[in-house]
């Protein structure tokens, strides 16, 4: 164990194990998660190949092998609970993206959300056993987030009771679905439904694309891999072109919308019901943002405690770089953000489960807010985590650029989340659409509930400058209630500004669509403010439920740091709205620096509490034992370029050149 890391852990003011229990949901969850992790670590079939030294084809093969082993082992160990499956996959796949992943994250959830009982009976068991390997084919070459623009067609033929699937243009070719290129034999395809000469919009169809047994593409199907990408090298993101490809009528998922044998269309109770899978995945991505940012913080903070560089006082030993205030200012707000997103991820997951249960009983009243909240928070958390991971990499100096640090892989694997499952700016605008509707309802005298209830205060003009002039004297920068209120006022103000600017554009005889585009920067700002408020509120609301005083104190400081750092970064909004004064902004900045000092003794223990195994981090710099330099040298020796003392290119190109000189 590196002596600096041993000293850091001994200096902590709390027991990290207690925070691990909180993050896992309970001590029993922690026990069970570790039990599952040990099943893998102690299994001779579990091999961890260093993906950094593999070709793309090798990475794909290893990932497929791991996926197959994973399914066999889950059967062997009797792992069936969704949360336990997630724990198992995380450690078993390590830093490999699984080519069969969309079978579990999209194909099966879509069957559950949109399939009838008969359809679930037909396809669920084979897909769980990987007889059917499914993917989710929505995105096309020419359209992604704009679903209405998708061009793939499914035309119903009542004579044969079949749908005829076509990719009528180059831009209509399905493009990007994970696992489509080489792995999947079925896809849930989103296509424009045409029956009796009329188009009824997007619907989901279960489409066999490869023959089971031979795995060869079926007639009428053109399918393949789209080529190398920024990351995800082991994932076979693919393309799919369909030419007059016929599937039975029963392959349309018909839990909500239906097509009768004669071609009659039966519309769903709500069009939003078909967005179930996207809402599920977006809610999952909030937790994924927390996980990825936590990994990067763990690596950067441990390494910053091990790395000694430069000097603060002359003639003294080189300090740990974690002692530099600038390093703390880079990393500790990100650590606080990782914790905020952990609690937010759990909140959104529980909210999704609760509302999904209500939807199952026919109550759709909370669906619009759930749709808006998951869209906005998906964008807010993935943007923030994406930038934070890169900040962690740069905080590791030159070694952060090496794949040995593990952070480049975390970054390239996470960054697509800013565009997949809805491009982030468009997601923010979806949230804004909901906020504008709520604003209009409040203006017409209706009281609203949920996370937007703060807009009820607008008609009383409590957010107008003359009314808020007294507010600055009440702001207590050490009170989380007071800071949550400040975020609430910022959100309300920016929602109102966006709404009034939108109305002004419409009153200038602009069409609603043009007015929306001309107000879109304000609308995104309003959504971001709403999401920021929700995050602060969820984090602050979690603290009173924590029993241990030492743990509560540490997390309270992180929550304060998260809230105050956000105010300093968005200072213009708080100052313009007279929510805080210039003098208070100076206090905020001073308090942030104090909180860095307070957090410093607990920084390593706080990342230890995430409880990542070294094999999960895949990092030489972020090792639990802190033995960085010895292992960095050993890692470099594994480079394929070092297999020979003299590379063959020397004999081919350099030696002939030198002999002629």
From Swiss-Prot:
The record marks 468-469 as: Cleavage. Highest levels of isoform 1 are found in liver and kidney while highest levels of isoform 2 are found in white adipose tissue. Isoform 1 is expressed at higher levels than isoform 2 in liver and kidney while isoform 2 is expressed at higher levels in brain, heart, lung, muscle, white adipose tissue and testis. GO terms for cellular component: cytoplasm; cytosol; mitochondrion; peroxisomal matrix; peroxisomal membrane; peroxisome. GO terms for molecular function: acyl-CoA oxidase activity; FAD binding; fatty acid binding; palmitoyl-CoA oxidase activity; PDZ domain binding; protein homodimerization activity. Its EC number is 1.3.3.6. It catalyses: a 2,3-saturated acyl-CoA + O2 = a (2E)-enoyl-CoA + H2O2; hexadecanoyl-CoA + O2 = (2E)-hexadecenoyl-CoA + H2O2; dodecanoyl-CoA + O2 = (2E)-dodecenoyl-CoA + H2O2; octanoyl-CoA + O2 = (2E)-octenoyl-CoA + H2O2. Keywords: Acetylation, FAD, Fatty acid metabolism, Flavoprotein, Lipid metabolism, Oxidoreductase, Peroxisome, Phosphoprotein. The modification Phosphoserine is found at residues 26, 649. FAD binds at residues 139, 178. A motif (Microbody targeting signal) lies at residues 659-661. Its main location: other. Its cofactor is FAD. Homodimer. Interacts with LONP2. This is Peroxisomal acyl-coenzyme A oxidase 1.
């Amino acid at each position: 164990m590196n002596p600096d890391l041993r000293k850091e852990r001994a200096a902590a003011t709390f027991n990290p194990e207690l925070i691990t229990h909180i993050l896992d949901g309970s001590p029993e969850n922690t026990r069970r998660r570790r039990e599952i992790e040990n099943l893998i670590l102690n299994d001779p079939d579990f091999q961890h190949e260093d993906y950094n030294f593999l070709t793309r084809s090798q990475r794909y093969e290893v990932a497929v092998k791991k996926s197959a082993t994973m399914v066999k082992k889950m059967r062997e160990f009797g792992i069936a609970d969704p949360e336990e499956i997630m724990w198992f996959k995380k450690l078993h796949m390590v830093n490999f993206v699984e080519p069969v992943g969309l079978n579990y994250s999209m194909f099966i959830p879509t069957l559950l959300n949109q399939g009838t009982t008969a359809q679930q009976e037909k396809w669920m068991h084979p897909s769980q056993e990987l007889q059917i390997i499914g993917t989710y084919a929505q995105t096309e070459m020419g359209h992604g987030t704009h679903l209405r623009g998708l061009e793939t067609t499914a035309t119903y033929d009542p004579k044969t009771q079949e749908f005829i699937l076509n990719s009528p243009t180059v831009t209509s070719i399905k493009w990007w679905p994970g696992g489509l290129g080489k792995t999947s034999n079925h896809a849930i395809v989103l296509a424009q439904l045409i029956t009796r000469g009329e188009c009824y919009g997007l619907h989901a169809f279960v489409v066999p694309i490869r023959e089971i047994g031979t795995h060869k593409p079926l007639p009428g199907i053109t399918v393949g891999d789209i080529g190398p990408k920024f990351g995800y090298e082991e994932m076979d993101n693919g393309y799919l072109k369909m030419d007059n490809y016929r599937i039975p009528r029963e392959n349309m998922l018909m839990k909500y919308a239906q097509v009768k044998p004669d071609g009659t269309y039966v519309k769903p109770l709500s069009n939003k019901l078909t967005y179930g899978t996207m809402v599920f995945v977006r809610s999952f991505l909030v937790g994924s943002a927390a996980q990825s940012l936590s990994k990067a913080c763990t690596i950067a903070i441990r390494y910053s405690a091990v790395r000694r560089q430069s000097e603060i006082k002359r003639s003294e030993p080189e300090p740990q770089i974690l002692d530099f205030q600038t390093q703390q200012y880079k990393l500790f707000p990100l650590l606080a953000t990782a914790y905020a997103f952990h609690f937010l991820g759990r909140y959104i997951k529980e909210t999704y489960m609760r509302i999904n249960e209500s939807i199952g009983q026919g109550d759709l009243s909370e669906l619009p807010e759930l749709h808006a909240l998951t869209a906005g928070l998906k964008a807010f958390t993935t943007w923030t985590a994406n930038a934070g991971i890169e900040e962690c990499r740069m905080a590791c100096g030159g070694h952060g650029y090496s794949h040995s640090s593990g952070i480049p892989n975390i970054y390239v694997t996470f960054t697509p989340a800013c565009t997949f499952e809805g491009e982030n700016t468009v997601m923010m605008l979806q949230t804004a659409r909901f906020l504008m509707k709520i604003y209009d309802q409040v203006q017409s005298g209706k009281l609203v509930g949920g996370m937007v209830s703060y807009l009820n205060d607008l008609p009383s003009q409590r957010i107008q400058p003359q009314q808020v002039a007294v507010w600055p004297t009440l702001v207590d920068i050490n009170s989380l209630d007071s800071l949550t209120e400040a975020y609430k006022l910022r959100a309300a103000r920016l929602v109102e500004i966006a709404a009034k600017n939108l109305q002004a554009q419409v009153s200038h005889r602009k069409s609603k669509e043009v007015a929306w585009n001309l107000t879109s920067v304000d609308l995104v700002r309003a959504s971001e403010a709403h999401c920021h408020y929700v995050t602060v509120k969820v984090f602050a609301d979690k603290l009173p439920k924590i029993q241990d005083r030492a743990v509560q104190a540490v997390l309270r400081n992180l929550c304060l740091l998260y809230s105050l750092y956000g105010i300093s970064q968005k200072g213009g909004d708080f100052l313009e709205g007279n929510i805080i004064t210039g003098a208070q902004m100076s206090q905020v900045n001073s308090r942030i620096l104090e909180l860095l000092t307070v957090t410093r003794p607990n920084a390593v223990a706080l990342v230890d509490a995430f409880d990542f195994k070294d094999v999960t981090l895949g990092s030489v710099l972020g090792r639990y034992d802190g033995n960085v330099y010895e292992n960095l040298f050993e890692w470099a020796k594994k480079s394929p370029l070092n297999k020979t003392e003299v590379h063959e290119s020397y004999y081919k190109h350099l030696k002939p050149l030198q002999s002629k000189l």
